[in-house]
C-alpha cells in the first residue's frame, strides 16, 4: 500500500504540472505516503520541528528561512547521511559550487526548469558530495541524481544530527545581477554570478508540493504563483521593460499604459506578478516609486523581506531596485 501511495502521488504531480514530472528530491518516502511533516523535516539544534520549514520559523519569528530542510533516512556507521539528492523537475544544471567554504550553503547545485510554464530554479544545498560527472548546462530528468546529502557550510558548523538537504524552489530577480554586484564594491566576492542568493527568492516548497498533490496546480506554476497572498503592490514609473517580465512572461500583464509597472509582492519579497499601470498618476515622472496598496496583516510579521517602514498606519519603501535590460 505504501508503494501504491507513492505512485499515486507522482501521478497527481504529473497531471498537475502539465505533464512534467515532479518528484521528492531525497530518498524519503514520508511525504508521498502522507505522513506528518515532522517525519521528514529536519529541525535546527533548537529541536523545534517548525524550524526546518519555510518562512519566519526561527528566532521567535525574527529570522527568515528560504526553503525546507529535509532529514536523512539512512546513515553510515559514522552517522553521516547517505541519502541521494535528485532533481525535483526535469531541467538543466545552471550552477555548481563544489567548494564548501565559498558559501553558507556549502556544496550546492542550482537547476533551472525551462520546460515548465515558469522557468523556476531549484536549489540543493549542504551536500556532502556532488556527482563528479555533473556539469553546468547538463540536462537531468526528474529524479536525476545530483549528489549526496550532507552538512557542508562555510558558516556555523552543522552537526551530524542536523544533516539535511536545504531545498528551495523560486524565481530570479534579474539577469543583470552580476554586473550590478560588481558595481557595488562589496567586500565579499561573488562566486556565483546571477545565481548569488541575493538574486534568488524562493517560495514555500512544502506548500507547493501539497498543492500539487491535491491537484491545485492545473493551470501550471504561473497560476499557483499568482495565487499566493499579496502583501504589497509597488508602482514603479519607467518605460523600460524589467528583466522579470522578459524572464517570466506568464507572470506579467502587459495590457495598460507604457509608463510603468505595478509589482505584486508576497510578504517575503517574491515578485509574483508584474502588470502595466492601468491608472497612472497625472504628472508622475520616470523613476518615481509609490505603494499602491498593501495588506496590513501580511506586512505586520516580525520578519519581512520587503524594505519598508511604517509612518503611523501607512507603510513606505526605504529602498527599491528594478533590474532592466536594453530593449
Each PLM stretch: what is its role?
Residues 1-4:
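Positively charged n-region of N-terminal signal peptides that target proteins for export
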Residues 19-107, 191-321:
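Surface-exposed, glycine-biased beta-strand/turn segments
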Residues 72-74, 98, 113-115, 126-128, ...:
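A mature extracytoplasmic/lumenal domain signature
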Residues 323-327:
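Conserved small/polar residues in nucleotide/adenosyl-binding loops
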Amino acid at each position: 500500500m505504501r508503494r501504491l501511495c507513492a505512485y499515486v502521488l507522482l501521478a497527481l504531480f504529473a497531471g498537475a504540472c502539465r505533464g512534467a514530472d515532479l518528484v521528492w528530491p531525497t530518498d524519503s518516502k514520508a511525504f508521498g505516503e502522507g505522513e506528518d511533516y515532522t517525519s521528514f523535516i529536519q529541525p535546527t539544534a533548537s529541536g523545534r520541528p517548525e524550524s526546518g520549514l519555510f518562512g519566519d520559523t526561527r528566532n521567535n519569528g525574527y529570522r527568515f528561512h528560504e526553503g525546507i530542510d529535509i532529514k536523512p533516512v539512512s546513515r553510515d556507521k559514522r552517522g553521516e547521511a547517505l541519502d541521494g539528492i535528485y532533481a525535483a523537475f526535469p531541467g538543466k544544471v545552471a550552477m555548481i559550487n563544489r567548494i564548501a567554504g565559498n558559501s553558507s550553503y556549502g556544496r550546492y547545485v542550482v537547476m533551472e526548469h525551462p520546460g515548465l510554464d515558469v522557468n523556476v530554479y531549484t536549489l540543493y544545498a549542504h551536500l556532502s558530495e556532488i556527482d563528479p560527472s555533473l556539469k553546468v548546462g547538463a540536462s537531468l530528468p526528474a529524479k536525476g541524481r545530483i549528489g549526496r546529502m550532507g552538512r557542508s557550510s562555510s558558516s556555523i558548523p552543522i552537526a551530524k544530527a542536523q544533516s539535511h538537504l536545504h531545498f528551495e524552489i523560486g524565481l530570479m530577480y534579474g539577469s543583470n545581477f552580476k554586473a550590478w554586484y560588481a558595481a557595488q564594491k562589496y567586500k565579499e566576492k561573488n562566486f556565483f554570478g546571477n545565481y548569488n542568493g541575493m538574486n534568488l527568492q524562493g517560495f514555500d516548497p512544502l506548500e507547493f508540493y501539497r498543492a500539487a498533490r491535491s491537484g491545485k496546480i492545473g493551470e501550471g506554476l504561473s497560476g499557483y504563483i499568482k495565487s499566493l497572498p499579496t502583501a504589497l503592490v509597488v508602482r514603479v514609473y519607467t518605460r523600460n521593460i524589467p528583466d522579470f517580465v522578459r524572464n517570466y512572461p506568464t507572470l506579467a500583464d502587459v495590457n495598460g499604459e507604457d509608463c510603468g509597472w505595478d509589482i505584486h509582492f508576497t510578504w517575503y519579497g517574491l515578485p509574483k506578478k508584474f502588470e502595466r499601470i492601468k491608472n497612472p498618476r497625472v504628472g508622475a515622472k520616470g523613476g518615481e516609486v509609490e505603494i499602491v496598496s498593501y495588506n496590513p496583516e501580511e506586512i505586520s510579521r516580525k520578519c519581512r523581506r520587503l524594505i519598508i517602514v511604517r509612518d503611523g498606519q501607512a507603510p513606505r519603501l526605504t529602498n527599491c531596485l528594478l533590474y532592466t535590460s536594453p530593449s
